[in-house]
UniProtKB/Swiss-Prot annotation:
Pfam families: Toxin_3
GO cellular component: extracellular region
Designated name of the protein: Neurotoxin LmNaTx15.1
Domain notes: Has the structural arrangement of an alpha-helix connected to antiparallel beta-sheets by disulfide bonds (CS-alpha/beta).
Superkingdom to which the source organism belongs: Eukaryota
Similarity annotation: Belongs to the long (4 C-C) scorpion toxin superfamily. Sodium channel inhibitor family. Alpha subfamily.
Organism lineage string: Eukaryota, Metazoa, Ecdysozoa, Arthropoda, Chelicerata
Domain LCN-type CS-alpha/beta: 21-80
GO biological process: defense response
Protein task: Binds voltage-independently at site-3 of voltage-gated sodium channels (Nav) and inhibits the inactivation of the activated channels, thereby blocking neuronal transmission.
Gene3D superfamilies: Knottin, scorpion toxin-like
CDD domains referenced in this protein's UniProt entry, alphabetically: neurotoxins_LC_scorpion
Length: 81
């Protein structure tokens, strides 16, 4: 049993498993990407490596799905304009 777990873990490491996440896009000033239409957000999300993006109208912000882990999707401080 332990051998099977070891082999499975090694296969995952060797294949380069990539984790994906969903969230709002933030710029370098900790501000969300503002939007008015889905096309803009789709373009921005894809440029960051995401699968899909849309304008979440309630917050007027771009929401992305399938982003790489390295992309900032959480606010880390105050938005400075």
């Amino acid at each position: 049993m332990n051998f099977f777990i070891l082999i499975a873990s090694a296969c995952l490491v060797l294949t380069g498993v990539q984790c994906r996440k969903d969230g709002y896009l933030y710029d370098s000033k900790n501000c969300k990407y503002a939007c008015v239409d889905n096309d803009y957000c789709l373009k921005e999300c894809k440029s960051k490596g995401g699968y899909y993006g849309y304008c979440y109208r309630w917050y007027s912000s771009c929401y992305c799905e399938g982003l790489p882990d390295k992309v900032k999707t959480e606010k880390t401080g105050r938005c400075t304009l």
